[in-house]
């Protein structure tokens, strides 16, 4: 880790770096009633690594974290947030390279993640008409989990099983990644010369993902 320096030095000889940034803002993406700080830390990391994987990354180098917090934020909240961040990095790879902290009116977690591009180059623009679309995970569960946690009335007239409620909340608070999907794509190529494939992250919903690929 290089958290004591102003910059992180990364060796990338003969490698292509993938870089992305994602932010979670209080009262826009989360609040203390919908998700605990530990799960929020996990989710913040997963959101970024998911973008890396959907762009062809086969290895996450690390992340930088910019944290903006109100002055009244309790230290225990910060510790739990970083425990969630650490747990996600240990499971999916990468280290904390550095970051920044500042005061603000609402809690904001902004993460920049760096990964190394693998054999496949994945771009939204590479999707072609007539191609088969593959998806990972179960779409809609995270949205339902958010609605349940937010106590929205939209689902009140629908009978939901305890199992579905638990699974939906879990998908919202602790989303999963499918890092082996790229290896499986490599094995299914009809032509080994194929390097570019259309792909996008679908955390904003299946419909939005399809629009991005169209």
Residue map of PLM features:
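Helix-biased detector of long, well-ordered alpha-helical tracts
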Residues: 1-214
